[in-house]
Amino acid sequence: MDTNNTNNINSLENPIDLENDPNILFTELNVKLESLITFLTKNDKDNQIFVDEIIDNKVTDLLIASKELENYFISQQSKYSAEKNKIQLKQEIYKVKKEIENKDRLIERYKNKVKEWKYHFEPLYQSQNHILHSTAQGLSGIENQFSPVFTPMPNTPSILQNLSQAKPSPSLGLGSTIL
């Protein structure tokens, strides 16, 4: 019984490094299971008095070892989740970076097109502008044939006023009106 207590104290004093090796946890769990099975199958008369107490200790040891293993798996799962989130974030950043690069290339391409169009159409525009201004100066004494013809706007309030006046309706009788 003293060796069991010493083993329990040693296992509690030497915490298992969960970061390094899960095999240690599996080995410890396996040893404790073997110890429990050996104890249960052993038929020693001297130990029959303490059977309940020893079984409780063995089961407690087994539960502690399984809890340590469970904690290890939980820590691994949280690490995996954190790594997964980092990878997803990196993928999203990469995707946005590619979109920006594509848009920058598109902007550069259209910027070059605008320059090309400007070099092509600017001389035409300047020559047409020069012709237009020289023609307008030559025709300053004559009525400008390029000026727009003035079209009077209808008097909108008087039209609305005429439409809103009451008029007799032949179908409704002499005194009726339609607005």
Swiss-Prot record:
Q: Which residues form a coiled coil?
A: 81-119
Which keywords accompany this UniProt record?
Activator, Coiled coil, Nucleus, Transcription, Transcription regulation
Highest taxon of the lineage: Eukaryota
This chain's function reads: Component of the Mediator complex, a coactivator involved in the regulated transcription of nearly all RNA polymerase II-dependent genes. Mediator functions as a bridge to convey information from gene-specific regulatory proteins to the basal RNA polymerase II transcription machinery. Mediator is recruited to promoters by direct interactions with regulatory proteins and serves as a scaffold for the assembly of a functional preinitiation complex with RNA polymerase II and the general transcription factors.
The gene is: med28
Q: What is this protein called?
A: Putative mediator of RNA polymerase II transcription subunit 28
Q: What InterPro entries has UniProt attached to this entry?
A: Mediator_Med28
Entry's family note: Belongs to the Mediator complex subunit 28 family.
Native organism = Dictyostelium discoideum (Social amoeba)
Q: Report the PANTHER family cross-referenced here.
A: MEDIATOR COMPLEX SUBUNIT 28, MEDIATOR OF RNA POLYMERASE II TRANSCRIPTION SUBUNIT 28
